[in-house]
């Protein structure tokens, strides 16, 4: 790795940079995109095409203090049932606007805690989805499972619904750290769940672990990673904890004095990364790892890796429909986002309309910049030939962008015969480099019009 001091001067430890799971990022969406435009974009999906679905369940039995996701606590099933009824109505709205023959290629249930849905609601939602968008034979159906909020009946219902992949949030197995973030989930409980899933024939197991949590040390992270690897997940994501109490007030419960500093965070990530690579996983992008033969590793090797709202993916569908409060949809034309408030979302759906609250219509420049950012984060390079073949950008203008970026990141970025490349030792700066192509982020010194 390039000298840490050099990377630090370029912003490694103090820059606040988007994850770029979309471009533009969601904070840059505007209110000018309406439910009518959302409906029109759905109607424009060609007959016989394929789409992906994301179903958002915002409810949790407990609110983990570290989490900044759009969630709300409930001890009753009543709001969950009302929400599920609205999801079925939203699916009916979708079905009414889809062209004949549109198929479901991929589906993900996230939250929140999707597994707090009772078995009957899991069955009902699966049937409503099947009625709205018939599945392909090879449809990949993934679900986020909380090991503390699952039982045999709900697992039965999910497998009967066609679940093929499970994502488990581990965070850290140290009891002290779990107590400090409001998420107690023992290794033994997680182990029993993974063994049950494998016994039932689960095709893919994903796991997330966090670094930068309070009280974390390199030896402690090593212990948690080794325990996680003993469960043989197919994919592992090593994600940085973002302490943003101004955005997520529940994080005020976490004592800031116990949170590792920037240099310590880098050491924690490198500790986890080294152990995972030693265990035979392949690194995919910045922070994902996959076993050889896993579709994600294959997509990475073939240059087909993409960014999505779940991170790195091999999903090639151009259209992603988000269902539920705050869910985001992606179309070739742009992005739409449902009302973040559950009550506002339910009110709109019950009145027979989508709850679209904001979004963004993509310009040609957005598409170009979005693709360059995606290439940097997926492949750590921008292919000159691919960009020129796909977009109407003058070669000399593209070279100007490359030179400006390379000058801003000396010793980290270089111009090659193939295009622009982030050197291996500079890859921790990939998101910061990508930000230099973001015309909506003033702190990233946006480039001029293309």
Swiss-Prot record:
Needed co-factor(s): [4Fe-4S] cluster
UniProt binding sites for S-adenosyl-L-methionine 1: 54, 111, 144, 328
Superkingdom per UniProt: Bacteria
EC number: 1.3.98.3
Residues involved in S-adenosyl-L-methionine 2 binding: 66, 112-113, 171, 183, 208, 242
Cofactor remark: Binds 1 [4Fe-4S] cluster. The cluster is coordinated with 3 cysteines and an exchangeable S-adenosyl-L-methionine.
Reactions catalysed, as given in the entry: coproporphyrinogen III + 2 S-adenosyl-L-methionine = protoporphyrinogen IX + 2 5'-deoxyadenosine + 2 L-methionine + 2 CO2
Residues annotated as binding [4Fe-4S] cluster: 60, 64, 67
Keyword Cytoplasm: yes
One Gene Ontology molecular-function label: 4 iron, 4 sulfur cluster binding
GO cellular component, one term: cytoplasm
Family the UniProt entry places it in: Belongs to the anaerobic coproporphyrinogen-III oxidase family.
Oligomeric form and interacting partners: Monomer.
The protein's name: Oxygen-independent coproporphyrinogen III oxidase
Annotated gene: hemZ
């Amino acid at each position: 790795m390039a000298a840490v001091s050099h990377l630090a001067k370029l912003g490694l430890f103090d820059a606040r940079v988007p994850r770029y799971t979309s471009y533009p990022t969601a904070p840059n969406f505007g209110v000018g995109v309406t439910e009518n435009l959302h409906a029109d974009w759905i109607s424009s999906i060609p007959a016989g095409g394929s789409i992906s679905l994301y179903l958002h369940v915002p409810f949790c039995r407990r609110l983990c203090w570290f989490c900044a996701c759009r969630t709300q606590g409930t001890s009753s099933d009543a709001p969950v049932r009302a929400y599920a009824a609205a999801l079925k109505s939203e699916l009916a709205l979708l079905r009414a606007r889809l062209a004949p023959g549109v198929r479901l290629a991929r589906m993900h249930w996230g939250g929140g805690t999707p597994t707090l849905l009772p078995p009957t609601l899991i069955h009902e939602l699966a049937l409503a989805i099947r009625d709205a968008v018939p599945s392909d034979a090879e449809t990949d159906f993934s679900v986020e499972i909380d090991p503390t909020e699952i039982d045999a009946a709900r697992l039965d219902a999910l497998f009967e619904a066609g679940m093929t992949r499970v994502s488990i949030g581990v965070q850290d197995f140290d009891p002290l750290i779990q107590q400090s973030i409001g998420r107690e989930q023992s290794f033994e409980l997680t182990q029993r769940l993974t063994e049950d899933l494998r016994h039932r024939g689960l095709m893919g197991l994903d796991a997330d672990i966090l670094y930068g949590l309070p009280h974390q040390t390199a030896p402690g992270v090593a212990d948690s990673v080794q325990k996680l690897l003993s469960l043989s997940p197919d994919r592992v994501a090593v994600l940085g904890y973002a302490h943003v109490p101004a955005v997520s007030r529940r994080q005020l419960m976490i004592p800031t004095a116990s949170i590792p500093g920037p240099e310590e965070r880098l050491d924690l990530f490198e500790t986890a990364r080294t152990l995972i690579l030693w265990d035979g996983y392949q690194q995919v992008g910045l922070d994902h790892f996959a076993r050889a033969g896993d579709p994600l590793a294959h997509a990475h090797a073939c240059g087909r890796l993409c960014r999505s709202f779940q991170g790195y993916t091999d999903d090639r569908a151009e259209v992603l429909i988000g269902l539920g409060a705050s869910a985001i949809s992606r179309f070739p034309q742009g992005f739409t986002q449902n009302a973040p408030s559950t009550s506002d979302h339910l009110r709109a759906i019950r009145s027979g309309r989508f709850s679209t609250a904001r979004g963004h219509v993509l310009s040609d420049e957005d598409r170009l910049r979005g693709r360059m950012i995606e290439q940097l984060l997926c492949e750590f390079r921008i292919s000159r030939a691919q960009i020129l073949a796909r977009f109407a950008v003058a070669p000399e203008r593209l070279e100007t962008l490359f030179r400006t970026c390379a000058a801003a990141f000396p010793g980290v970025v270089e111009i090659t015969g193939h295009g622009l490349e982030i050197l291996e030792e500079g890859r921790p700066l990939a998101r910061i480099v990508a930000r230099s192509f973001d015309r909506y982020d003033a702190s990233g010194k946006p480039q001029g019009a293309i």
